[in-house]
Amino acid sequence: MRKLSRRLRELYAKVEDRPYAPLEALQLLKETATAKFPESAEAHIRLGIDPKYTDQQLRTTVALPKGTGQTIRVAVIARGEKVTEASAAGADVVGSEELIDEIQKGRMDFDLLIATPDMMPQVAKVGRILGPRGLMPSPKAGTVTFDLPQAIQEFKAGKVEFRADRSGIVHVLFGKASFSAEDLLVNLKALQESIDRNRPSGAKGRYWRSVYVAATMGPSIQVDINALRELKLAEAA
């Protein structure tokens, strides 16, 4: 077993093995973000789903009201006037078939890929490259659309795509550890509501199993699920 550094031992000692009230958990997250670089705030949520069944898969988006604290590079694959439209709307990388060819050759200088529906048959050719990186455009994620200005604006403003992995766990960055605990709570609440709103039709039994938050290099902190779900928006704002 790897030996923990003194810094990590001290951080782990601050966290009790119990569910914390949401705001208390986020205050503790900030307190344990002591790395020498700007840490992100992460949520790790275990759901009662088995994604090997199509009716128990979760892939959707959430608009984080307080943003992500990150600058993301958006790429768009379109044709004709939609290329000009995407550039004018602030896309960082724009192209048609030639961009697909560049991706096939290894180009990956973007964090998010949006495509117009008419380009999806061509985009499918690089699905094996994009899929494992979580970059394959999807209607569910809002990344297959003709309304490019709105999609670009939303993702740059803090809209985040997420999915449950094969174990039914959702991993999401929901802000920076430098955000106030109150702002992190607003974002975490928005994430919880999106997960509830998009509950897979085949999910049976207890949907929410556990919620943990952590700074990038910090210990995991358990959040009281019921307290988070019962929290009113006015309290979180």
UniProtKB/Swiss-Prot annotation:
Keywords (A to Z) from UniProt: Repressor, Ribonucleoprotein, Ribosomal protein, RNA-binding, rRNA-binding, Translation regulation, tRNA-binding
Molecular function terms, GO-annotated: rRNA binding; structural constituent of ribosome; tRNA binding
GO biological process, one term: regulation of translation
Disulfide bond keyword on record: no
Stretches assigned to coiled coil: none
Residues passing through the membrane, by range: none
A GO term from the CC aspect: large ribosomal subunit
Pfam assignment, any one: Ribosomal_L1
Gene3D superfamilies given in the database record: 3.30.190.20, 3.40.50.790
Keyword set includes Cell wall biogenesis/degradation: no
Family statement drawn from the similarity comment of this UniProt entry: Belongs to the universal ribosomal protein uL1 family.
Alphabetical list of HAMAP family matching this protein: Ribosomal_uL1_B (MF_01318_B)
Biological role stated in the UniProt entry: Binds directly to 23S rRNA. The L1 stalk is quite mobile in the ribosome, and is involved in E site tRNA release. Protein L1 is also a translational repressor protein, it controls the translation of the L11 operon by binding to its mRNA.
Subunit structure: Part of the 50S ribosomal subunit.
Protein name: Large ribosomal subunit protein uL1
